Amino acid sequence: MSSYLQESTRKAVTVTSLQGMRAAGERIAMLTAYDASFAALMERSGVDVVLVGDSLGNVVQGQKTTLPVTLDHIVYHTECVARGTTKALLMSDLPFGTYGTPEQAFHSAVRVMQAGAQMVKLEGGEWLAPTLRFLVERSIPVCAHIGLTPQSVHAFGGFKVQGRGDEAAAQLKADALAVQDAGAQMVLMEAIPATLAGEVTRLLAVPTIGIGAGPECSGQVLVMHDMLGVFPGHRPKFVRNFMDGLTTIDAAVTAYVTAVKDGTFPGPEHSFTA
């Protein structure tokens, strides 16, 4: 049995303990979940952070993007996931159009926190710093999502790797420092070159979570449906199907946690170059 599965003696994961994991060099394993049953399974398997992502628009609702996801959708799924978790930290996305001003972000975050979230995730860099600071000053833990931000898919002209080239890399570093200075307790980086993600991770004092950002981040996240190989859409380069060769979902999630913790995932084949 994996050493990460000591559920009876496992302490609840908190924002503070995530910082401690980073300091100790223990990688953080995060997965998305959208209901109580899968959330409980992930907790049994040693997942540190469960994310109610707006990816539910793609994998649950069948949408082409995350843009149609509403705050009511996130609140509902957060309530469901909260019923299945007691030890993993529960993070929820604020969906598109719900944090245009600091005040709107606060009211959106309050609803999600009241539904059971312990941290909220917002997409944006330097421009988002005043909003992040506004939330943190009001005791709402925040994770900033930089790099490829799916809510900006149309502004990017599609799902494209970010941070390539000197100017883009410098901007991403500036984004990371700005959101940290604003009080973000975690930074998620998506679809950026692995070397750049490593540089940002060493630059920051808070944990970094990667998805398509190489192996040097403080932790990793995948969408549950992707890592189980059940999503019929395009499989991104950074995804590994952990169901391959296994017969149960529990075993696949445990394999994911183990691979993240021991540093065997992601490999070079899951990472982007500059």
Curated annotation (Swiss-Prot):
Protein location: Cytoplasm
GO cellular component terms given for this protein: cytoplasm
Catalytic activity, as annotated: 3-methyl-2-oxobutanoate + (6R)-5,10-methylene-5,6,7,8-tetrahydrofolate + H2O = 2-dehydropantoate + (6S)-5,6,7,8-tetrahydrofolate
Cofactor binding, per record: Binds 1 Mg(2+) ion per subunit.
Presence of keyword Metal-binding: yes
This protein's UniProt keywords: Cytoplasm, Magnesium, Metal-binding, Pantothenate biosynthesis, Transferase
SUPFAM superfamilies: Phosphoenolpyruvate/pyruvate domain
Active-site residues, record numbering mapped to chain: 190
Cofactor: Mg(2+)
Recorded metabolic or biological pathway in which this protein acts: Cofactor biosynthesis; (R)-pantothenate biosynthesis; (R)-pantoate from 3-methyl-2-oxobutanoate: step 1/2
Enzyme class: transferase
InterPro entries, A to Z: Pantoate_hydroxy_MeTrfase, Pyrv/PenolPyrv_kinase-like_dom, Pyrv_kinase-like_dom_sf
Keyword Ribonucleoprotein assigned: no
One GO biological process term: pantothenate biosynthetic process
EC code: 2.1.2.11
Residues reported to bind 3-methyl-2-oxobutanoate: 54-55, 93, 121
Highest taxon of source: Bacteria
Binding site for Mg(2+): 54, 93, 123
Entry's transmembrane regions: none
GO molecular function: 3-methyl-2-oxobutanoate hydroxymethyltransferase activity; magnesium ion binding
Function in brief: Catalyzes the reversible reaction in which hydroxymethyl group from 5,10-methylenetetrahydrofolate is transferred onto alpha-ketoisovalerate to form ketopantoate.
Family: Belongs to the PanB family.
PANTHER family: 3-METHYL-2-OXOBUTANOATE HYDROXYMETHYLTRANSFERASE
Subunit structure and binding partners: Homodecamer; pentamer of dimers.
Protein's UniProt name: 3-methyl-2-oxobutanoate hydroxymethyltransferase
